[in-house]
Amino acid sequence: MPTPATASEFLLVDVNGSAQIKRSGQSQYQSARGGMRLNIGDLVRTEGGAQVRIRCSDLTTTWTMNSNIERGVVWGCPPDGGFSLRVGRQSDNTLGGIDPTLPYIVTPRRTVISDPQPMLRWNPVAGASRYTVQVIGSDVTWETEVSGTQVQYPGTPPLTPGVDYRVIVEADTGASSQLDVGSETATFELLYPEDLDLVAADVAQIREQGFPEETEALAIADIYIREDLLAEAIATLEPFVASGTQTLEVYQALGDIYRYIGLNLLAEERYERAIAIATSNEEIQALADARSGLAEVKVLLEQPQAEIDLLIQAQSGYERLNDTERIQELQARIDDLT
C-alpha cells in the first residue's frame, strides 16, 4: 500500500465576508474561499465582520476565526495532531490507464476498500460484447462472465482483511486488463473492521459540523485518503463532477488520486477542468497546482514536451507568488527532463 506524503493539509471550510490568505514562502495575499487547501505556515486574515472556519490537519477538528485578525492556520488546532495525505505530491506518478483499447481496471485499483462486496468496474472496449472477470488472491479464486462493464463481487468466497487481491478482465475481443502497463499495481485489499469503525466515527464527526456540501465532501474524502480508501474518496467526489461543480479543488483532488492509482486518462480530464476553472477565476496558485499535476500525467502519456511546457507555465505562476520552494522543485524536475 502507498507511502504517505510529507505535507499535512488544512482545509478552509467556509468564508463569511472578506478574508485573504498568504501562503508560506509567498509574499502576496490572495482572496480566500471555501474549499481552499492550506498548509502549515499559511496565514489567514479577516476584515470587517468576516468569519472563517478552518479544518485542522487531524482531519476532524475545526476552529473558527473571527473578524479583523490574522492567524496561522494551526492557531486553533490541537498540537501534534496532523496526518499526512497520501496523494498529490509531484512524484506521485503511477503508470496505467492510458490505452482505451484495453479493459483496464477502474475500481478497485491501488486502494483499500471497506465493502467486502465491492463493485468491480473496468474500461469499456469497442466491439466487445462479453467480459470474463476474475478476482484472484492467496485465498480467493472467483470468476464470472458479464455483458456490461461492471459487476458486484458476491462476497463468496469472503475477502480477508489485509490480503492483496487483483481483478482481471478479458474481453471477448482478446483484450485483457493484464496488458495495461499499470496492471501490476492495480490491486486492492479489505480494511480491518476495527479501522472501519474509526473511519466511520471520523466521517460522522465531519457530518455533524454543518459544512457546505462540497467542502464536506472534500473533508470526508481526506479521511478516506488517509486510510488509503481511494475508491471511496473517488466515489465521494465524482458525483459533483457529474453535476458540473465549479469547485476546482474537487477536480484537483480527483486528478491527484487518478494519477496516483494509475488512471491517467481520467487524471488528464480532471486536471484540464481544474485548469479551465482556475484560469477563469484568475487563481494563480490553483492554476499552477493543476498545471504541475497535469505535467506529470503528460509524461506518463508519453508527451514529454507537453510536460516541460506545463512545468514551465506552472513555475511562472509560482514565481508570481514568490513561492521559492515550488520554483526550485519544478526547476529540478525540468532539469531532469531536458
PLM segments and residue spans:
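Glycine- and acidic-residue-biased ligand/ion/polar-headgroup-sensing regions
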Residues: 5-26, 45-53, 57-61, 65-94
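Alpha-helical segment of the N-proximal tetratricopeptide repeat
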Residues: 205-246, 256, 260-263
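Long, contiguous interaction/recruitment modules in multidomain scaffold/adaptor proteins
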Residues: 72-77, 83-217
